[in-house]
């Protein structure tokens, strides 16, 4: 380690540049500030973010959810891609930045780095997990417009936690059981619809294994058991919650198209949020 410092930042001999050393130490202080106060931290119960603000602060919660979304959509090796966004604001603020300023800048950078792909590319075959997380963030952000204040659904959304261990799965299964009201024709049109954004959610592999190839009716009962408190835990996908909120009576090909178009419109609208 010392040899690396000696090569790139000499601290002894004739090549010492005191200004470079000072700049480096100041950068370390800023990085420590960003990590300790401005960077979301996973906890046993979700995530924590300091910013020297009360945990009930609305903008702090919004910033925490945005960073949580970015955290799960990156790996331990790619967090640096958006850590630099924090450093930019810390540097410009010459200390702890205003939470709203940090949120606005990070949201702007996310919009820039992740442009919305076409609807047709958001398929089962693609690596599109970011867009399911982003949609969940949009639903959480607009929860007061979407859900009734005292509804079980609102309680679920208020306590939603982003998690990494998620995979994209079908709502109406690829090979439905015989008692399912939803059946696929052996056509390219049905195959495309089956694998389209409207018929997909992102859930844990454990839940997917438990409900593998189960009918929509069985999955609806599963979601309802969370809403009425019969099962502990919570819904793993707010997109899935929207499906069962709006299509409690059944899931068919028209519903898949309608839901997919609406959710894609919400993704487009997410770029207008500031």
Regions found by a protein language model. Give the residues of each.
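Flexible coil/loop and intrinsically disordered segments
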Residues: 1-274
């Amino acid at each position: 380690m010392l040899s690396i410092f000696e090569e790139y930042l000499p601290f002894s001999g004739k090549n010492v540049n005191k200004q470079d050393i000072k700049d480096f130490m100041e950068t370390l202080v800023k990085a420590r500030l960003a990590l300790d106060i401005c960077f979301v931290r996973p906890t046993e119960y979700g995530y924590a973010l300091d910013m020297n603000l009360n945990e009930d602060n609305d903008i702090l919660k919004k910033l925490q959810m945005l960073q949580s979304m970015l955290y799960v959509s990156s790996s331990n090796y790619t967090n640096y891609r958006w850590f630099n966004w924090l450093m930019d604001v810390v540097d410009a603020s010459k200390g702890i930045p205003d939470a709203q300023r940090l949120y606005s800048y990070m949201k702007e950078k996310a919009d820039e780095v992740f442009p919305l792909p076409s609807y047709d590319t958001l398929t089962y075959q693609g690596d599109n997990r970011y867009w399911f997380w982003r949609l969940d963030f949009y639903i959480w952000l607009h929860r007061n417009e979407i859900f009734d204040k005292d509804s079980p659904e609102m309680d679920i959304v208020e306590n939603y936690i982003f998690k990494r261990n998620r995979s994209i799965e079908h709502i109406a299964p690829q090979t439905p059981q015989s008692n399912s009201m939803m059946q696929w024709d052996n056509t390219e049109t049905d195959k495309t619809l089956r694998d389209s954004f409207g018929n997909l959610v992102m859930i844990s592999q454990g839940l997917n294994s438990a409900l593998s190839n189960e009918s929509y009716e069985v999955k609806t009962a599963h979601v309802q058991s969370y809403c009425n408190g019969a099962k502990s835990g919570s819904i793993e996908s707010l997109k899935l919650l929207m499906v069962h909120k709006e299509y409690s009576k059944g899931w068919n090909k028209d519903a898949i198209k309608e839901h997919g178009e609406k959710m894609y419109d919400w993704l487009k609208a997410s770029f207008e949020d500031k």
